[in-house]
Amino acid sequence: VFAENGVQLGNNNAFTEGVDTMKAAVSDFSPEAVAEITGIAASEIQRLAQDFMAAKTAICYGRVGVSTQGFGTLSQWLINVLNILTGNCDSVGGVMFTAPAFEILRQRKDPNIFNRWQSRVRGLPEFMSELPVAAMAEEILTEGQGQIRALITSCGNPVLSVPNGQKMDAALEKLDFMVSIDIYINETTRHANIILPPATGLETSHYDITFHVLAIRNTAKYSPPLFPKSENAKYDWEIFQELAHHFKGETADFKPVPPEAILNHGLKTGRYSIDLQQLMNAPHGIDLGALESCFPARLFTADKKIQLAPELLLQDLKRAHAFWQQSKQQSIDFPYALIGRRHLRDNNSWLHNSERLIKGRNRCTLLIHPVDANVLKIDNQQVVKVTSRVGTVELPAEWCTDMMRGVVCMPHGYGHGRANVQLDVARKHAGVSVNDLTDEQLLDDLTGNAAFSNVLVHIAAV
């Protein structure tokens, strides 16, 4: 973009800072320089950039897979930089932002929400009072002041969803006490001393606070429960509030605040001044209009400007450059790079317990390019052994020409064959967990986030 004078900030020109700094920072990453590591010819990279710049509207877009690897933060930053530099941010046809009826974004008095404190064992940075999940097992297993001795989980399954799941499994066994708010006895909740099953599904009301913020149009929709909850059942919000009440040591009578009260207040004080009753009178929701340009008003920087080149991220570019040089040397012991995938019908582990969603051909396979498979003398659907630094699993190989040579791929959320799991449907499709191969020591060094992709592995026929 810089080489072809393609910078077109458009309406963002007056409040975007750091363009020249950005130009200098990426000068070493020319199409010719990155062609080998990306596997994309320099001419093709140039064509993509030219097409992007020439398009009337365009969006560069990345989601979970981009985020959960060793340079996730850097990648998401550069995606935004590309959209901003080409005039595709806060403009029709480009990346735009919602004006939700229930606002969850606020200007903070203290904008510093990163690395205010660190994890006890490895010193990983916090973000918004949360620690990277890669630190979870070690914080339970490592003795000393501040060791985690008790745990509450809520509708989560870290044994299958965090790196080095076997270590996580072992860590949960060492807890003094564990409570799970869940409707399933799964790979994680089987360790709990107490399981508190909340009312769920069609027994609950719903207002999607998160996805109204991420929508392609401004809308608001409330869904009341279709059925009353069963006798003596509690909603999850009742359980959370009562637990918090008791943790505080309060003994007075306690009456939980229903989410409808919070929602109604937020709607009435929001930009549209609607209320919950209006939503209840509109069962299909209320259309609040198309997305509109909202910069600089919607920016949360203190000076209401886009800071294109923060120093923290510029420094991480140097790490990327060093990694790029090092990655040219292939590992002899672990020559293949493992990445993850999610299928539309089973993208989370709990969906495997639905017969309608899990039915069909086996999706827990190792995707591998046929040329790599032939080198390893692996037939299509042959069982293979995959080994990383932390573990070994066995599963069928599936030839796939969409895979890049040297890269293999496994799905998320399987591994239901562990003892005492009470998921009748899922156990019939147990598969193996990709997170028994992922490594809690592999991180996005900038944030400490787990790197679930680009895990180096060895593959052999069984």
Predicted segments with their positions:
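Conserved short loop/turn motifs at secondary-structure junctions
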Residues: 36-40, 63-70, 102, 155-159
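Glycine/threonine-rich phosphate-binding loop and adjacent beta-strand/alpha-helix elements that clamp
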Residues: 202-229, 239, 244
